[in-house]
Amino acid sequence: MKKQNLVSFSDNLEAMRKFSETYAKRTGTFFCADNSVTAVVIEGLARHKDKYGAPLCPCRHYEDKKAEISATYWNCPCVPMRERKECHCMLFLTPDNEFTSDLQEIDKTTLLEKIASS
């Protein structure tokens, strides 16, 4: 059973990595200059997707995560991101943000290395 959960998390991690890259390109946003921030946020999204079935924003505190997921407001991409390009997690940054990089991709190896070292 643990092996199945690890496979599921690995699949969700890759899905969230690909989603993040695609969404950044589609919205003209970029990842943080510190790619460990990008990695930790993608990991958090994958963990929530693995545990709850939805990529709930990992950067906020929730009294009831299941209720928040049902409300969908903080499911990534959250409403503030979709409406105003405001990402609380700093996963998707606008070009004028002082912490932005020119990157819209993070390779799988870098992602795994940054997660392992966090």
Curated annotation (Swiss-Prot):
GO terms of molecular function: 4 iron, 4 sulfur cluster binding; electron transfer activity; metal ion binding; oxidoreductase activity, acting on iron-sulfur proteins as donors
Transmembrane segments: none
InterPro entries: FTR_bsu, FTR_bsu_Cyanobacter, FTR_bsu_sf
Pfam families: FeThRed_B
Cellular component GO terms held in the UniProt record: chloroplast
Enzyme class: oxidoreductase
Principal location class: plastid
Binding site for [4Fe-4S] cluster: C57, C76, C78, C87
Residues the record marks as active site: C59
Keywords: 4Fe-4S, Chloroplast, Disulfide bond, Iron, Iron-sulfur, Metal-binding, Oxidoreductase, Plastid, Redox-active center
Gene3D superfamilies named in the record: Ferredoxin thioredoxin reductase catalytic beta subunit
Site residues by UniProt (Increases the nucleophilicity of the active site Cys): H88
Disulfide bonds: C59-C89
Cofactor: [4Fe-4S] cluster
Note on cofactor: Binds 1 [4Fe-4S] cluster.
EC number(s) reported in the record: 1.8.7.2
Subcellular location: Plastid, Chloroplast
Coiled coil: none
Substrates-to-products reaction catalysed: [thioredoxin]-disulfide + 2 reduced [2Fe-2S]-[ferredoxin] + 2 H(+) = [thioredoxin]-dithiol + 2 oxidized [2Fe-2S]-[ferredoxin]
Oxidoreductase recorded as keyword: yes
Summary of the function given for this chain in its UniProt record: Catalytic subunit of the ferredoxin-thioredoxin reductase (FTR), which catalyzes the two-electron reduction of thioredoxins by the electrons provided by reduced ferredoxin.
Family membership noted in the UniProt record: Belongs to the ferredoxin thioredoxin reductase beta subunit family.
Record's subunit section: Heterodimer of subunit A (variable subunit) and subunit B (catalytic subunit). Heterodimeric FTR forms a complex with ferredoxin and thioredoxin.
Name of the protein this chain belongs to: Ferredoxin-thioredoxin reductase, catalytic chain
Species this chain originates from: Porphyra purpurea
